[in-house]
Structure formats: structure tokens, C-alpha cells
Amino acid sequence: MSQAAETLDGWYSLHLFYAVDWASLRLVPKDERDALVTEFQSFLENTATVRSSKSGDQAIYNITGQKADLLLWFLRPEMKSLNHIENEFNKLRIADFLIPTYSYVSVIELSNYLAGKSDEDPYENPHIKARLYPELPHSDYICFYPMNKRRNETYNWYMLTMEERQKLMYDHGMIGRKYAGKIKQFITGSVGFDDFEWGVTLFSDDVLQFKKIVYEMRFDETTARYGEFGSFFVGHIINTNEFNQFFAIS
């Protein structure tokens, strides 16, 4: 049996995607619509307080295209905290006008493919802690997609030796390093949590960088032979103080 990669796991992650039911929302009187938007704003401003205590983080983006209108991404120390957030969100009046289109449950993950040998406790390493328990950037754009490592009769990632996988992941990582300063990447593991094995969340102030890195990695052996991908979601940041304009209907 091939040796399994060890992982370091950080905050639990929940991506929630919604489409706005504009037709129904249009029937709501303006004063009532303003009230439910204000309630939504207050909810998200309250959940965002974890950032200052370094006990979680969140991001809100307006998704481009018809897959969704809004992405709410929450990071928390415990899975049950994500349940609480989702349950409380569903009780908001605005939730009656937001149609769930997709969700993804995972946990911030670092693998040991590229790690050197050390007796140090990795969870005490400041660099590693910053990656496992991150402060999310307020970049203009976000890109999210789920992925698997292929396992079929021809190409099976899980039948490769540890040394083979380490070599492939090293080459793969070298491409990613070319985009340092342009893209911020977060990998979340989801084996046993969701339908794919990993979620990839990218941040950048230049949306074109998403296309460039994904295209370049198509030629990398790790992706070309072993990568399988779900849907891609791309969007622009939206702040809670922009909600009145976003939900405004003339």
C-alpha cells in the first residue's frame, strides 16, 4: 500500500453560494426591503468580529455569471461553529430571498509533500500557523473551485509512491511560486466532508491572473494526468456597506 501524505489541519471552512430571487424581492416594499438588508448587514458585521480576536475570518463576494450572486466564506475553529452561523443565517428575513446554489465544507490543509524533516512542533511555527489560521486578504477578486486527484485504471494518484508524488508536487509548486505577490492561495481538504477532495480558493487584485495560473498548470504533469475539476466560481469583493446599493431595485 502506498504511504498516505500527512496533513496539518487548521480552521474549518464553509463556502456558501446563493442566487438572489430578484422577482420575489421586487414585490417587497422599500422600507421592508431596507430593514431586511440592514438585518443582513448587522449579522455579517457581528460574525466578522472573530477577525480581531484571531478566532476565524470571513469573506463576501459578488459572483459573476449565473451560477450564483453571492459567496459567503466562513472560517472557524470548530465545525459546529459553521453550523451555528448557517442556522442563524437561515433565520434572517433576507434568507427567504436567497436561493442556495452550491456549498462546500472543508478544512484549511497543508500536506507534508514538501516539508523537510524537523523535530519542531509545526503548529508552533509562526509561518505555518499563519497559513492554517489565516487572515484573509481583501483582494478585489476571488476564484473558487473543487478538485480531485484522478484514480482510474490508467492514472491513479493514490497508487504512486510517496517519492513520485513528492516530485510531482514539487514541480507543481514551482509554478505556483511564480505567482507570489499576484495570487494568494488557500487549499482546504474535504475528503470525507464533501463531494470533492480539495477546495482551492484564490485571491487577486487582477482577475486575469486566475486564468493565467490555471492555464499554465494545465501543462504540469500533476494536473495534466491526475487533476479533475469541478465548477469554477469567480467574483468581485462586496462590502456590507455596499449592500443597500446591491439590493436596490428601482
Curated annotation (Swiss-Prot):
Pathway: Porphyrin-containing compound metabolism; protoheme biosynthesis. GO terms for molecular function: heme binding; metal ion binding; oxidoreductase activity, acting on the CH-CH group of donors, oxygen as acceptor; peroxidase activity. Pfam families: Chlor_dismutase. The active site is at residue 145. Its cofactor is Fe-coproporphyrin III. Keywords: Heme, Heme biosynthesis, Iron, Metal-binding, Oxidoreductase. Fe-coproporphyrin III binds at residues 131, 145-149, 172, 185. Its EC number is 1.3.98.5. HAMAP family: Coproheme_decarbox_1. Involved in coproporphyrin-dependent heme b biosynthesis. Catalyzes the decarboxylation of Fe-coproporphyrin III (coproheme) to heme b (protoheme IX), the last step of the pathway. The reaction occurs in a stepwise manner with a three-propionate intermediate. Belongs to the ChdC family. Type 1 subfamily. This is Coproheme decarboxylase. It comes from Staphylococcus aureus (strain MRSA252). The gene is chdC.
